[in-house]
Amino acid sequence: MIGREQQGKNVIVRATLLLFIIMGFFSMMAYLHTYNTPAQLLHLPIVINTWTFINATRVAYRTMQSGGVTERIALDGIEKGCNWCEAHPDHCDFTVGYGGSPNEWGQTTLDAMVMWGPTREVGAVGYMKRVKPAISVARKVMERTYHTILVGDEATTFAVEMGFEEEDLNTTRTAEMWREWKAAGRKPNFWKGPHNSTQGVTKRKEMNEKPEFGRWNHDTIGMVAIDQQGNVACGVSSNGATWKIPGRVGDAPIVGSGAYCENEVGGAAETGDGDVMMRFSPSNRVVQMMKGGMHPKEACERMVAEILRYYPNCSGAIIAVNKQGQIGAAYMNLPNGFPFCLQNSNMKDAAIITIKD
């Protein structure tokens, strides 16, 4: 028989354990409330995207305000917003969609990616030809396959199987650009050192004059959205670098590089010299810094500083938004600063914000 003293000790132990369990439960609830509760979020829905593509911002925001097309409202906003640029490349600097950024063979190819924060699902296409709504095909990869990325002609074949129409991505504009580039000695380009062409033209030596990054020749629309329920989505669409070597896939469809989001934290997207940017997974890194409590602005600035340590001439920018609705952006080696677009429920219309030193 257990003595009264031992019984008393057992009661104390059980009471202490119960107290720890109760305290742990309420601590967990407080953590979840702080991190996830939509009531604490500011001015939802919210959309941010790179550059001055403000009509894409408006379309994304209106899509989310209207309730979206599916239950994945933030993802609907991302898709429809980027679709606008893909269908109107003349309003998005010809750096998104058809009719821009031809490669060495004069072809326009497309890269795109979408990510759904609640489940971390991702779909992407790279070096896709002859299909215009690249981000919609990327979403089909996410929702209709177990894969993450499809590339090249096989991505086109998949798109056609999903009901998308094959169309020529080249235009009279890109054909003229290509003719002028060839007449100028096929410079600039992305080769290092002397190179012998396999295309039947004369030997090309000292062809390593890499194109300078700029808004007009090497760009991306990267977008992050948070809907009224607090769900986060992100996406990217691009026609890549002008005069890229055929077969090149840029940073846009690479998850963690072109864009990245987590439902508990927020999201980020980048634009710039993709061949350098993708080496750092900058969007993922910024989200992880925000996850550790860092303000989006500081996270973007730290990421840019790290890239510059290794590539001091790299040009580009990063945008980010956290679940509290705080916005951040940073850029490098852009002489005129960096513009991005924002719209939330506290604004009458979308706005272009330009950051400068």
Where are these regions (language model features)?
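Short, low-complexity, Lys/Arg-enriched N-terminal segments of secretory-pathway carbohydrate enzymes
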Residues: M1-N10
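Alpha/propeptide regions of enzymes that mature by internal proteolysis
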Residues: I12-D357
